[in-house]
């Protein structure tokens, strides 16, 4: 009897996952995330140099980050532009150096282009959440400016904190020395989960439950790490793009990776936004099933079945939700 109950519970669990995946698929088709990802990839490439320039400018304003600029650049290139090659890094650093020597008007233009990227991300995620109420211009600009200024500082602070933790003497003990490589290897994954979690909870202009955002963040982080390794493997093992594009091969490489990255980000957002919709639908379906089962119970007891009208079902469901 216990085994039958366990099998039934497992079956219900898998059916629930299957129904959620079907609901997620309908949502993905409806929201056309491939088109949204293409738009965000284009805006990202347009604002890549301004974003890096603003980031490095913010970090250079704090003396504590001056000694780890190379470490921060390595972290960004390794995790966000995998297998793009040294050529891309040299060009980006050269562009950033040229941009930082510009006039006040030029620097202001860089900030505006960087804010355009943050605004595009904000609009795309709020469209996924079906948010009807828009932020005021003052609130939106304040949030964009906060992300632009505090984001680089948080990245730098997290790397400084990681370096400090790794240098602690507690890791020199024999019992913990084997844990250090594992901890270092898991750091990018932890950073990805934290970044996606913050993105899915802060950007939507409505309340997002922590567990829903955490689920979307974990899925997105896993896909992001797998995508990095898979894309790097493809670029190194199947370099057919070089035969086609020659010296310009780095351009499609960067664009394809940025596009795939945004597909992963939007997929995690869709999972986070779809969870409450699916749970509400399942809850309302259970309520309706229980209400419609009442006439059958009356008939089994010999009473004339009291058929509920659709208005009565709706009213009872509203009462149940209010309770």
Curated annotation (Swiss-Prot):
<feature type="transmembrane region" description="Helical">
    <location>
        <begin position="213"/>
        <end position="233"/>
    </location>
</feature>
<dbReference type="InterPro" id="IPR017039">
    <property type="entry name" value="Virul_fac_BrkB"/>
</dbReference>
<comment type="similarity">
    <text>Belongs to the UPF0761 family.</text>
</comment>
<dbReference type="Pfam" id="PF03631">
    <property type="entry name" value="Virul_fac_BrkB"/>
</dbReference>
<keyword id="KW-0997">Cell inner membrane</keyword>
<keyword id="KW-1003">Cell membrane</keyword>
<keyword id="KW-0472">Membrane</keyword>
<keyword id="KW-0812">Transmembrane</keyword>
<dbReference type="InterPro" id="IPR023679">
    <property type="entry name" value="UPF0761_bac"/>
</dbReference>
<protein>
    <recommendedName>
        <fullName>UPF0761 membrane protein Shew185_0314</fullName>
    </recommendedName>
</protein>
<feature type="transmembrane region" description="Helical">
    <location>
        <begin position="45"/>
        <end position="65"/>
    </location>
</feature>
<feature type="transmembrane region" description="Helical">
    <location>
        <begin position="102"/>
        <end position="122"/>
    </location>
</feature>
<feature type="transmembrane region" description="Helical">
    <location>
        <begin position="247"/>
        <end position="267"/>
    </location>
</feature>
<keyword id="KW-1133">Transmembrane helix</keyword>
<feature type="transmembrane region" description="Helical">
    <location>
        <begin position="182"/>
        <end position="202"/>
    </location>
</feature>
<dbReference type="GO" id="GO:0005886">
    <property type="term" value="C:plasma membrane"/>
</dbReference>
<feature type="transmembrane region" description="Helical">
    <location>
        <begin position="137"/>
        <end position="157"/>
    </location>
</feature>
<feature type="transmembrane region" description="Helical">
    <location>
        <begin position="4"/>
        <end position="24"/>
    </location>
</feature>
